[in-house]
Regions:
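Short cysteine-rich clusters marking metal-coordination/redox-active sites
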Residues: 5-8, 25-28
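Cys/His-rich microdomains that often coordinate metals
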Residues: 12, 32, 74
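Short linker/helix segments within small regulatory modules
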Residues: 14-24
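Short Cys/His-rich micro-motifs in 6-15 aa windows
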Residues: 29-37
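A short beta-strand-turn-helix
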Residues: 40-58
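Short pre-active-site segment immediately N-terminal to redox-active cysteine/selenocysteine motifs
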Residues: 55, 62-66, 109
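Typically the conserved alpha-helix immediately C-terminal to a functionally engaged Cys/Sec
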Residues: 69-84
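Non-catalytic, surface beta->alpha helical segment in thiol-disulfide oxidoreductase systems
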Residues: 109, 114-141
């Protein structure tokens, strides 16, 4: 999975089992504290590993690069990830790159959000939302 450094914006690869650990950016060597932004899911195996190892709820943003509302909501998702740090993992799934996940969870419109607990979806909603709404919604899962 990829975590973006807040200092130099380099995308750093992190194993799902280490998302709660602190690390160091491979480029600028600044600390990569856990939960500072959304985790970019690279493949189905990483997604499954994240859900299997998560000890907190996982909020997933299903999006696509061509989707205007998805682009508009991206900063809101990032803000929600910072606010929810330690209480919820926030992940992003590009439905164009990972259509199997979109099909598995019956994503028919984007942006779509699902909250998972113990590997199972417990909440879902579709459409653009503000960070405070995401925090309120996902924080109660």
């Amino acid at each position: 999975m990829l975590i973006t450094c807040t200092g130099c914006h380099t995308r750093n690869r992190v194993a799902p089992s280490h998302l709660a650990d602190t690390g160091t950016c491979g480029r600028c060597k600044q600390p990569l504290p856990p939960g500072q932004g959304p985790v970019e899911i690279e493949n189905v195996a990483d997604f499954d590993a994240l859900l299997a190892s998560a000890t907190v709820p996982v909020l997933v943003d299903f999006w696509a690069p061509w989707c205007g509302p998805c682009k508009m909501v991206a900063p809101e998702v990032a803000a929600a990830a910072r606010t929810l740090a330690g209480r919820c993992v926030v992940a992003k799934v590009d439905t164009d790159r990972l259509p199997a996940l979109a099909q598995r969870y019956q994503i028919t419109g984007i942006p779509a959000f699902k909250v998972f607990r113990a590997g199972k979806p417990v909440l879902e909603r579709t459409g653009a939302v503000h960070a405070r709404e995401l925090v309120h919604w996902a924080g109660g899962a």
